[in-house]
Amino acid sequence: ESVILWQSFDFPTNTLLPQQLLSRNTKLVSSRSQTNHSSGFYELFFDNNNVLSLLFNGPEVSSIYWPEPWRVSWEARRSTYNNSRIAVLNSLGNFSSSDDFTFLSNDYGAVLHRRLTLDYDGNIRLYSWEKERQTWVVSWQANQRPCRINGVCGANSLCKYVVGSGRKCSCLPGYKMKYGPDWSYGCEPEFDLPHNKHESVFLL
């Protein structure tokens, strides 16, 4: 008799496939960037209140940003009473979670190749394979306002959404981008901060 000792479906990375369970013992972790596929700063998991949540787990701060933390669970249409902590996507485009969160894809009902991915920018998106164009298209996403995603532009920065071109990050006056094309590192001062413990500086 054959016994399964290990299977990849039990250990998702940043993506769930149809019928693959997300449970209390698993989570999705975003990649670092579009080209760097090491673990990033965003996680999708069930929190201690049994709610499916998105977490920004940055180098200096950690915070849940979805559902909106200022809402109580019933305002966000979530239930905390079911502690089974299971979520699953089916091949028709229906996602269902034990906290009562559910959604249907824009193309619900069609049998397509699908994947639910926690992207590097902290947004969850459902992708459907469009056979004619031979490409993945977004058929649902959790956050329509990318600037509400925690840490998306890093520290000391501003986030602005431009219709047609998407999210734009910029540094605060007196700051510069810290690391190349990766905005998640944020911005650093263009001026030198004093290292002498007897000196002080006052910033407006």
Protein language model features and the residues they cover:
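Beta-rich ligand-binding surfaces for carbohydrates and other polyanions
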Residues: 1-204
